[in-house]
Amino acid sequence: CGPCARRPSKGESRVKLVVTEKNDAAKQIAALLGATKPKADKVFNTPVYRFDVDGEEWVTIGLRGHILEPDFTPSLIYKKRGGWSGVTAEGEVVPATLPASLPVPPFKKKKPFTADGVELKGWKMEALPYLIYAPIEKLPKEKDIIRSLKNLAKKADSIVIATDFDREGELIGSDALACCREVNATAPVSRARYSAFTKPEITHAFANLVPMDDDLAAAGGSR
């Protein structure tokens, strides 16, 4: 993303955003990397820590573990020409693949069935054969933290995902990055991998940043 990265305009400060899994991790990383004592701050109601590294402004924010949670789309609709689709909580229509053995509309309007599909929210017994094939969407779990994260991401010149070094951490980081990308599509992104909160370990991790591991995140999501 180097060539396409957003460049700060004249007079605009560069900000590196570091995203950790928990508030304590954000606090410790700021203390270990900062040239001086970090400044504790809040974005809305979320604690963040601001500090300086070689003249560049950095800010760390801690999540609360998973900030998104998977769920089935709340309904399915069927059209003769296009087949089945899922309808997300936001009303977006997404592809769905259901077996041909399942009955298709028109249905009588008796819950959970509608004229052109199936309502899945109530987990009615009659809907279960359809539910297991419904598309999965990710819904906000920690809305306040997501709001704060997006506020920082808008202003970020680069983003470092510094969640835990395991598949769960990779998934949490991937979800956080998805939220950041909604407001900042071009900032370069890298991954800090570390196994202990010591100055040598954290310094080494941030001096040797790597790409995100999509396969590891997918493994976390399939659990």
Which ranges hold each PLM region?
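Short, Lys/Arg-enriched N-terminal segments with co-localized hydrophobic residues
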Residues: 1-14
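Intrinsically disordered, low-complexity regulatory segments
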Residues: 12-223
